[in-house]
């Protein structure tokens, strides 16, 4: 059965979110593995991230966030972990999942080993989630979470530091 046939956001339950949290930790470990290579090859960032940063400089922060956090993960996951493996490669889904994983990596434009590790590793983890649990919603949710953390991390850090600021500066903001 295709993941598109039984698409249902109600499957995102607390146990599913807990499982996705473990996969999120695995994705972060993948990023830690890729970072030394990226640092050596490209100053610590990917060409894809540089392009997103450039686009961000010309787009409203919230609108860009909606695209990065909602639109891109839904479209990428549906294409790479549902349409390619289950429709285009119907009857040969394992090969289709691998093809989808490679296509996802290709979409992010890797040109160095560090970028291949970063995006290829992320793609394999997201693919495993979709393949193992036969629920595209899980990989979409995981992808959205990862992008949200990456996109809004400065805001999250500031919010976390706000209580510390108040302690040291006695509520004088």
Task: Name what the model sees in each region.
Residues 1-21, 41-44, 84, 134-137:
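Membrane-helix interface linkers and caps
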Residues 28-40:
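Alpha-helical transmembrane segments of multi-pass membrane proteins
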Residues 39-58:
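Membrane-interface interhelical connector segments
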